[in-house]
Amino acid sequence: MSGAVDYSEMRFVDLKRKVVFELVREREREALKAFYKRMNETSVRLGCSKKTNFAVAHGMHHDRNYSTALDIATISCNAIRNHPLLADVINTKYYECRSRLLPNHCYKWKNTNDMIWDSSKCYYGVKTGVTQTAGPCLSVHYKSSCGTFDFIIVVLNSKTKEARFLEIPKLVEWAIQKIQRVKKINYKPSLKRQLLRNLAHF
């Protein structure tokens, strides 16, 4: 009959689509598993503790996705030292591009790290983030204008999104005082390393 719908064929097509969809989804799952495994292997290689584990790629909350301020600082330091392109991206204030599929559509991004807008020009990326359990978080690279001080400051579970940016200058001042104190006292190298490690845990 002209115009009649062949439901058996329609169901077969739907079945094929479902099979293809499941195959694609399974490959995606396997790819993500491999990616998580690689992330955790890399974190261990960089010297992160067992208190760090990655279980998602998007950065949102997951019960098996956790870390510490020291480990985040370790990862941040490696990123800016060994990946120049990433260092350039995280310090970009604005970026825009046009879609290949929609040439007239322009995408615009603004860096959410308020510290890179600071007039002192001593702050650089690294990462902002907020989840329900971790709260407002921030990893920042501080480098003094004279080049004397160069370190990473990490804030986790700040009271508000705005508060994390206000806490950074205070932590920088505190860290500089601690570092200067360490330099003035003639500690044994092992004790000095331990004091600096405690500083990173603050």
Residue locations for each model-derived region?
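Penicillin-recognizing serine hydrolase domain
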Residues: 3-201
